[in-house]
């Protein structure tokens, strides 16, 4: 949420990029996929957004170290973790996700040079045919947030 109650153009662009990654990531979490495969796919979503924002280049991606992809410069943490008896519950990195599992989806973009960081977090329940957004009632669009901040 912007402290001033209104996004600058740059804040809005970065916020919307994070929101697109979050929404894309939510559709990827489904029964049968492993967290490892999921994180690779989310990395691809984030890479596209960071290129579009001018934060990394296609050349950097082509020459990246697979152990530390180019997107890690601005998105250095994981995208999701299990939620259960504990906030960061235990789960298996290589085992397929199952219906009934609950996960966070929490992408972020951090631009140290601009003193700008945006992270969104959502919680979802995996179902047999998709997911239930456990935080679907919370406004996420930039315009909705600005309207809420205006009171």
Go through the PLM ranges and name each one.
Residues 1-151:
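Active-site neighborhoods and metal-handling regions in enzymes and metal-associated proteins
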